[in-house]
A protein has these predicted regions:
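Short, well-structured N-terminal submotif of metal-dependent ribonuclease cores
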Residues: 1-41, 54-61, 134-138
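Acidic, PIN/NYN-like endoribonuclease modules and their adjacent C-terminal/linker elements
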Residues: 3, 72, 105-138
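A generic structural signal for short hydrophobic patches within well-formed alpha-helices
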Residues: 11, 46, 83, 119-120, ...
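Active-site-proximal, substrate-binding regions of enzyme catalytic domains
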Residues: 26, 53-74, 81
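General small-molecule cofactor/ligand-binding pocket signal
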Residues: 40, 76, 128
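Amphipathic alpha-helical segments within well-ordered protein domains
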Residues: 47-50, 70, 87
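Active-site neighborhoods of divalent-metal-dependent phosphate/nucleic-acid chemistry enzymes
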Residues: 74-117
Length: 138
C-alpha cells in the first residue's frame, strides 16, 4: 500500500475546481477509493483549503467540501514534536512546509503530492506533482 501525503495546494485546487490542474488533482484524490492507496493530509492543509474554499463558496459550502474530503483522506498529527522538528531543522526556511513534511513522515508517507515541489527542497520523501504521481503510480 502506498501512503501519500496531499499538500494544501492540491486540496485547494479540488475544492475550488481550479483549472487546468483540477482534473489531475481530482484523479489523485479519487485514488483514496482504491485499496492500494492511503491518502493523508494535515490539519494545517485542511485549514488552508477551508480558507480558500470559504472565500470562494462561503462558510457553509466550504464545510461541506471539507467533510467530503475527510470521508476519503486521513489526517496526520501535528503535535509538539512535529512543530519542534520543523523549527529545529536549519535547512527548513518555511515552518509550515516543515510541519507538513514531518507530519507526512510520521505517518509513513512515501510520497508528497504538491504542485509546489520546490517548497520541499529539503525532503527525503519523494515529492511529485499530480500528473507525475498519476504517471508513476498507476
Amino acid at each position: 500500500m502506498k501512503q501519500v501525503f496531499i499538500d494544501a495546494n492540491v486540496l485547494v485546487t479540488v475544492v475550488n475546481k481550479k483549472y487546468p490542474l483540477f482534473s489531475d488533482a481530482a484523479k489523485v484524490l479519487s485514488l483514496a477509493d482504491r485499496s492500494e492507496f492511503e491518502l493523508f493530509t494535515s490539519p494545517v492543509c485542511l485549514a488552508i483549503a477551508f480558507y480558500f474554499a470559504e472565500k470562494k463558496s462561503g462558510t457553509s459550502q466550504a464545510k461541506v467540501k471539507l467533510k467530503l474530503l475527510l470521508d476519503h483522506i486521513k489526517i496526520t498529527r501535528v503535535d509538539d514534536k512535529i512543530v519542534r522538528q520543523a523549527l529545529n531543522n536549519a535547512a527548513i526556511h518555511d515552518v509550515e512546509d516543515g510541519m507538513q513534511y514531518y507530519s507526512a513522515q510520521s505517518s509513513g508517507c512515501t510520497y508528497i503530492v504538491s504542485e509546489d515541489k520546490d517548497d520541499f527542497y529539503f525532503s527525503e520523501i519523494k515529492v511529485v506533482g499530480c500528473k507525475e504521481f498519476l504517471q508513476t503510480c498507476l
